[in-house]
Amino acid sequence: VGVGMLGRFEEQDINDMNPEMAAYMATRMFPDLIVGIKSAHYWGADFTQVDQAVKAGTIAKVPVMVDLGEHHPPLPIEELFLKHLRPGDIWTHTYANAPKDREVPVDENGKVKPFIFEAQKRGIIFDVGHGGGAFHFAQAVPSIQQGFVADVISSDLHIGSMNGGMKDMANLLSKFMAMGLSLQDVIMRATWNPAKVINRPELGNLSVGSVADVAVFSLREGDFGFTDVRARKLKGTQKLEAELTLRAGRIVWDLNGIASPLWNAR
C-alpha cells in the first residue's frame, strides 16, 4: 500500500505500512488478484515490517511472504519462524547465502540448524525464490542432503535471473533433479504445492474443472551443467525442455510444432 515497492529506500517508511489498508485492498478491491501480503527489503533492526504484514494477512485471511532485507547484525530467523510468522506463512529465498546480511539455514559446519526442521513441521512454508542473487549450492545441496527441502520451487523471474543461473522454470526444476529430487517431486513443488499455499485449488492440477494450464516437457538425457547465482556449477544427467504450453486451454508455446499439422497436409 502507499507508494508500494518503488525501491529500497522507499520501502523503509514504517508510516507507509498500513495493515488495515493492505487488507482492504486484498479483500475488497482486488480479491481475485491478491493472494497474499509481502514484507520485503526492510533494513530495520526489528520485525516491525513483518508484524505489520502479519496483521494485514490476519485481517484479510491470506498468507504472508517474508523477504528479509539486509540487517546488520542479521535478524534471528528462529524468532521469525517460531514467534512472528503463522503456519502457512512463507519465507522466500530459502537457499540464499549472505550470512552477513541475513541468517542462513545451514551453519558454518555444513549442518542445517535444528529449528529449521521445527519451523517446517510447524507449518512455515519455505520458498526457493531463485532470482538473480538468492540461490547458492552451498546452502541448497547440504540442506537437501539432510532432508530440508523447500516446499515450493519458484523462479523469481526477472531480467537478472533469466540471464543468470536461473534461466527458466524448466532449467530450475532440472537443477533440483540434479540435487537428488525426483521428477514427480519437483513437479509437485512447482504446481500443486504453491496452489495450496495461495488458496487457489483450481490451479496447479489437471482435475476436472481446473484451469487448463498445461506444460508438456521432454526429458533429455546427457551431460548437463547447472549454475547458481555465483556461477558455481553442479553437474546433472537429466534436463527438462518445455515442448508445449497451454494457458487456459490455449496453446501459447509449441517448440517443435507438435500441435500443428504438416504444411502439405490435406
Regions flagged by a language model, labelled:
Residues 1-14, 38-41:
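Metal-cofactor-binding active-site regions of metalloenzymes
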Residues 3-4, 97-98, 160:
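A short, flexible beta-alpha/helix-coil linker loop
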Residues 9-11, 100-101, 164:
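Acidic/histidine-rich helix-loop elements
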Residues 16-126, 134-151:
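Histidine/acidic residue-rich metal-binding segments in metalloenzymes
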Residues 83, 198, 204-207, 237, ...:
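Residue "hotspots" at secondary-structure boundaries inside conserved domains
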Residues 96, 131, 157:
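Active-site metal-binding loops of divalent metal-dependent hydrolases
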Residues 138-221:
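His/Asp/Glu-enriched, well-ordered alpha-helical/loop segment
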Residues 211-265:
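C-terminal cap of metal-dependent C-N hydrolases
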